[in-house]
Amino acid sequence: MSLDISNYPVLAQANTPDELRQLPQAVLPQLADELRGFLLKSVGKSSGHFASGLGTVELTVALHYVYNTPFDRLIWDVGHQAYPHKILTGRRDKMHTIRQKGGIHPFPWREESEYDTFSVGHSGTSISAALAMAVAAEKEQAGRKVVSVIGDGAMTGGMVFEAMNHAGDLHNDMLVVLNDNEMSISENVGALNNHLAQLMSGRFYTTIRESSKKVLEGMPVIKEMAKRTEEHLKGMVVPGTMFEELGFNYIGPIDGHDVDALVETMRNMRNLSGPQILHIMTKKGRGYEPAEKDPIGWHAVPKFDPSTFEKPASKPSNPTFSQVFGKWLCDVAEKDDKVLGITPAMREGSGMVEFSQRFPKQYFDAAIAEQHAVTLGAGFACEGLKPVVAIYSTFLQRGYDQLIHDVALQKLPVLFAIDRGGIVGADGPTHQGAFDLSFMRTVPNMVIMAPSDENECRQMLYTGYCYREGPTAVRYPRGSATGEPQVEEMQALPIGKGLIKRQGQKVAILNFGTLLADVLTAAESIDATVADMRFVKPLDVELVKELASSHDLLVTVEENAIMGGAGSGVLELLQQLKQPMPVLQIGLPDEFIKHGASGEILAELRLDAAGILEQIEEYLK
């Protein structure tokens, strides 16, 4: 997307932070306006994360203006809000390629730019990384500064407080910017707090504060009284006592859309010693009315025309697997008030909006705290309740210890509805659901199911709901289901039993999951037998034995890492049965899968019908 200089006269002079820092401070408000306008048009053409970036425009300008990036380290938590950062760090003309195959990465990415000092995608990691860089900077003694930017949502994660507790103890110089976009800030409160922040971060206040500490070192009783008095006085006007208790000097809250106030406050804070936290108030979706009114709905958008003030109407399609899950959850909750739905801050994405509205007392949003969400489910199961933990595959990784220690070890009947299993597409390697079958297979007492369509998904969810001998997992992909007519009656499936979907000869394909349609298409060309295995664990032992004894080659197909996945389970079983035979494993390779459209990625990995057939024919040569 080339830049029309007539529409962006200041932005045209700020293609890099070095150029930005040459501009007079007086033009920064205009730069912010132009940057917001450019972001609006570029995301409209490319699709992508939208509302978060609109809310961090002034912050991004101020950070790169005050800090000498990339020498000074700037770390963005999660990265949804980093589009303005990408625009100002030499990637402006490539923004139209973001999240597309071969285009720039959806999140800050070390391989992409020296300004992206830490690759991100999951929340709550920035302060730990920043602390490490601050320790390294102190050892280096080159005057390097370190800044972490984290949103208020990520502050619900336990890792954040672990890092802050450690930072307060080590006391290295670092700044944490808390971007609080839960509410807009009124003009009066904004003016008051902007003034207080500049006063409290200024040289006069901090000199008195530090000098007083030195004077009182030998008088611990008076020192403690003075500390409590300071905290009390600050607590009367600012909500920072909690951060002070963790060892941080708290400044704020200030208006995160006042670029001049941000610059002045950061200039003051740049020279403060020890860990600092700057609390700013922003509005998600700032500058675009529909996104301001509905920041969740405009969090990520398809391609759209900003001038219409609405997203394009979605084309009629089959329901998504997330919607299938959400409807199933409502169906069982209508008949059983012991059913509880748990999500770690993914209500919309997991299809739980209707459930949360209809059954508010049975709905629990654990916030961005996957470990807590899993153990919350374990506790409910201990009391005879029926917890369903709806979680993305990539985020279940964060609750793996709890899955083992708190759920499986105690054989607790917790049902895991695992969304985004397999290729998720545009969000890239931090979000692909590549590993869940592999890491769950190793856990004793687990029952793992992979549906081939939405009806199997409903039946498997019901199977997990009925199963009381231990934890169960139903793993399904992102996106639309296959369009199978819904079977209303739900019946529990026999545990560990698959189905023959096509009878052939010589080659038997064991399918795990929603690639079944492609597998059946490939099988037609070579007259292969196709089995819908349904259960990854326990495997259908009798079916595997039968197929192995009547065919020359077994082929396993899964949208999961080959290493340790369902195919590995088949190989292990054959070894136990002392029934060795050729097995071709088809799945995700031993690499992190890059971003792009899901269909493009599956084709590139040869996991579409043509690719599956090609791999089998190559093996048979």
UniProtKB/Swiss-Prot annotation:
Pathway: Metabolic intermediate biosynthesis; 1-deoxy-D-xylulose 5-phosphate biosynthesis; 1-deoxy-D-xylulose 5-phosphate from D-glyceraldehyde 3-phosphate and pyruvate: step 1/1
One GO cellular component term noted in the UniProt record for this chain: cytosol
Subunit-level organization: Homodimer.
Membrane-spanning segments: none
Residues annotated for thiamine diphosphate binding in this entry: 80, 121-123, 153-154, 181, 288, 370
CDD domains recorded: TPP_DXS, TPP_PYR_DXS_TK_like
Biological process per Gene Ontology, one example term: terpenoid biosynthetic process
Superkingdom of the source species: Bacteria
Function: Catalyzes the acyloin condensation reaction between C atoms 2 and 3 of pyruvate and glyceraldehyde 3-phosphate to yield 1-deoxy-D-xylulose-5-phosphate (DXP).
Sequence positions that bind Mg(2+): 152, 181
EC number: 2.2.1.7
Catalysed reactions listed for this entry: D-glyceraldehyde 3-phosphate + pyruvate + H(+) = 1-deoxy-D-xylulose 5-phosphate + CO2
Protein name stated in the entry: 1-deoxy-D-xylulose-5-phosphate synthase
Name of the encoding gene: dxs
Record text on cofactor binding: Binds 1 Mg(2+) ion per subunit.
Alphabetized GO MF terms: 1-deoxy-D-xylulose-5-phosphate synthase activity; magnesium ion binding; thiamine pyrophosphate binding
Cofactor: Mg(2+); thiamine diphosphate
Family the UniProt entry places it in: Belongs to the transketolase family. DXPS subfamily.
Keywords: Isoprene biosynthesis, Magnesium, Metal-binding, Thiamine biosynthesis, Thiamine pyrophosphate, Transferase
